[in-house]
Amino acid sequence: GVLDAFRKIATVVKNLV
């Protein structure tokens, strides 16, 4: 769902930082 996509994006952002 939308929340899952947002969570996935948040995880990617965390990995980039």
From Swiss-Prot:
Q: In which tissues is it expressed?
A: Expressed by the skin dorsal glands.
Where Valine amide occurs, the residues are 17
Q: List UniProt keywords, sorted A-Z.
A: Amidation, Amphibian defense peptide, Secreted
Q: Name one GO biological process term.
A: defense response
The subcellular location is:
Secreted
Tell me one Pfam family matched here.
Answer: Antimicrobial_8
InterPro entries recorded:
Antimicrobial_8 (IPR012527)
List the record's Gene Ontology CC terms alphabetically: extracellular region
What protein name does the entry list? Uperin-3.2
**What is the protein's species of origin?**
Uperoleia inundata (Floodplain toadlet)
